[in-house]
């Protein structure tokens, strides 16, 4: 991790990888007084690690003069200021954890440190990084998570540790030169575009960097030009001989303990980031490919003649496609129409089922009424014929008791033709009415069957026609009842007429009193004496 530039960690990624360093080990929770009491023995101790996390420290005093100290854990305290000679008193420090404190600035003496590799500043109200931090060539990991940084700009911070140090070195070189009035009117460095930002590249070794520093000290203007040129994409193949030498040196390679510590810290920070993503729906640890391409667009080497014709990456290629309000309104309208159509179809099906149920119930009632009428008719037909036979057998003629002769009740010569023809006419009329009713009923049944076969009409129209059919059926039923009632009345009248004739003929057959019937006596005398 520490020996080559391939282990460089960007600030945002380092924040994710170094979240919970203080959570991996058992942290002492003793107050600051106890800490000050026990530090006296630590000063002369040869232990390279000192853990004072969550100790309630408010300031750092001379108790930290431990030259052999390599790892110092001060997270979750109340520190506000770091002494100016802090890094000079701890020359062998490689790991410094200052997370969750109240530090607003770092001392400028950090630039002279030669062994610092990891610096954790998460959750500190720090707004500006010291320019001297760019000269710490041994720094491999920098955690700036949740820090309200204003210098360097956020675009530079997002590029990573290499870009931050390069920006700070360039700033220091530019502001160390004497400026003319024209250079003072130049726009500030913070108004940089994406194309002007530094890109992470291969770092040179410490010897090469020292040689370059010596050259820059001799020629400041040339150093500025070289620092500016380092922002542009490389044109020539870099010389890797120095890089190979630095890679071969064993002292630059990370130790097994540091690798284990980095890995453990990374695992805990990844778990913490997963919890944050689930809670607040934050962005992923790695940027999308489109954003990476937009940030690293300066790596591409454009042709000189096509510099002004090249199109910048549009927002559509970086951001996801969003529906316009018009398209959203159209989609919502279509969804509403589909719901309305489904509801309308369901209502039509329900109305059709209800209509079929009503028609079935009406047909069942009509059949029951017809069956009752048929049974009544059969009962009447069973009762009437025996009476007719009895009347016909008993009323062919009347018996005269005087001369013991049968006298016809209605002599053929004396019967009126109208009385003989009236029963025949009534029978013909009743038969004609019955035929007409049968034809009407058949036509009505055929119409109902045709309507049932055709289902293309609206439910309301079908309900109206069903009501009309029901009214017609009730009218036909009333006519049938009237016709049957008329037939029964005619039969009763004929029966009453027959019984009346019998009552008129029976007294003539009985013995008559001749003393009270002078007319009969006179007629009898006439008959006798003639």
UniProtKB/Swiss-Prot annotation:
**Pfam (any one):** LRR_8
Q: Where is this region: Disordered?
A: 178-215, 402-432
Assigned keywords, A-Z: Coiled coil, Leucine-rich repeat, Repeat
Residue ranges of the LRR repeats are 46-67, 68-89, 92-113, 115-136, 138-159
List, alphabetically, the InterPro entries matched: Leu-rich_rpt (IPR001611), Leu-rich_rpt_typical-subtyp (IPR003591), LRR-SigEffector_domain (IPR050715), LRR_dom_sf (IPR032675)
Coiled-coil spans in chain: 327-385
Q: Which domain of life is it from?
A: Eukaryota
The record's annotation in PANTHER family points to: LEUCINE-RICH REPEAT AND IQ DOMAIN-CONTAINING PROTEIN 4, LEUCINE-RICH REPEAT-CONTAINING
Any idea what this protein is called?
Leucine-rich repeat-containing protein 27
Origin organism is Homo sapiens (Human)
Gene, per the UniProt record: LRRC27
């Amino acid at each position: 991790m520490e020996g080559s530039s391939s282990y460089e960690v960007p600030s945002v990624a380092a924040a994710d990888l170094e979240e919970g360093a203080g959570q991996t080990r058992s942290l002492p929770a003793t107050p600051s007084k106890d800490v000050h009491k026990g530090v006296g023995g630590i000063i002369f101790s040869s232990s390279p690690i000192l853990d004072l996390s969550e100790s309630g420290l408010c300031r750092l005093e001379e108790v930290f003069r431990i030259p052999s100290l390599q790892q110092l854990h001060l997270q979750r305290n109340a520190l506000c200021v770091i002494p100016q000679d802090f890094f000079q008193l701890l020359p062998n420090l490689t790991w410094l954890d200052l997370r969750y404190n109240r530090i607003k600035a770092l001392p400028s003496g950090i630039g002279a440190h030669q062994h610092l590799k990891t610096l954790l500043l998460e959750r500190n109200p720090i707004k500006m990084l010291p320019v001297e931090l760019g000269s710490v060539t041994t720094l491999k990991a920098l955690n700036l998570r949740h820090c309200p940084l204003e210098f360097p700009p956020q675009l530079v911070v997002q590029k990573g540790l290499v870009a931050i140090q390069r920006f700070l070195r360039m700033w220091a070189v530019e502001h160390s030169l004497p400026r003319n009035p024209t250079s003072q009117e130049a726009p500030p460095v913070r108004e940089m575009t994406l194309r002007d930002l530094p890109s992470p590249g291969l770092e040179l070794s410490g010897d090469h960097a020292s040689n370059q520093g010596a050259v820059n000290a001799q020629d400041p203007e040339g150093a500025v030009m070289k620092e500016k040129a380092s922002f542009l994409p490389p044109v020539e193949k870099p010389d890797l001989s120095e890089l190979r030498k630095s890679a071969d040196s064993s002292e630059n390679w990370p130790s097994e303990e540091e690798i284990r510590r980095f890995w453990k810290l990374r695992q805990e920070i990844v778990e913490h980031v997963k919890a944050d993503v689930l809670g607040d729906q934050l962005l992923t640890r790695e940027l999308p490919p489109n954003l990476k391409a937009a940030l690293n667009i300066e790596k591409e080497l454009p042709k000189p003649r096509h510099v002004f014709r090249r199109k910048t990456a549009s927002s559509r290629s970086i951001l996801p496609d969003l529906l316009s309000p018009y398209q959203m309104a159209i989609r919502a309208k279509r969804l509403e129409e589909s719901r309305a159509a489904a509801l309308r179809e369901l209502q039509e099906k329900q109305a059709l089922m209800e209509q079929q149920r009503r028609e079935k119930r009406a047909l069942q009632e009509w059949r029951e009424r017809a069956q009752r009428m048929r049974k009544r008719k059969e009962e009447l037909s069973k009762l009437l014929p025996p009476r007719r036979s009895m009347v016909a057998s008993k009323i062919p003629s009347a018996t005269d008791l005087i001369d013991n002769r049968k006298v016809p009740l209605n002599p053929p010569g004396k019967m009126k033709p109208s009385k003989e023809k009236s029963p025949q006419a009534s029978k013909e009329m009743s038969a004609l009415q019955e035929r007409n009713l049968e034809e009407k009923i058949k036509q009505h049944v055929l119409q109902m069957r045709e309507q049932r076969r055709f289902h293309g009409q609206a439910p309301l129209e079908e309900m109206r026609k069903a009501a009309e059919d029901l009214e017609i059926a009730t009218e036909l039923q009333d006519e049938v009842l009237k016709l049957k009632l008329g037939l029964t009345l005619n039969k009763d009248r004929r029966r009453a007429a027959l019984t009346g004739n019998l009552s008129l003929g029976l007294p003539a057959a009985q013995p008559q009193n001749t003393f009270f019937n002078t007319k009969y006596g006179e007629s009898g005398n006439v008959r006798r004496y003639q």
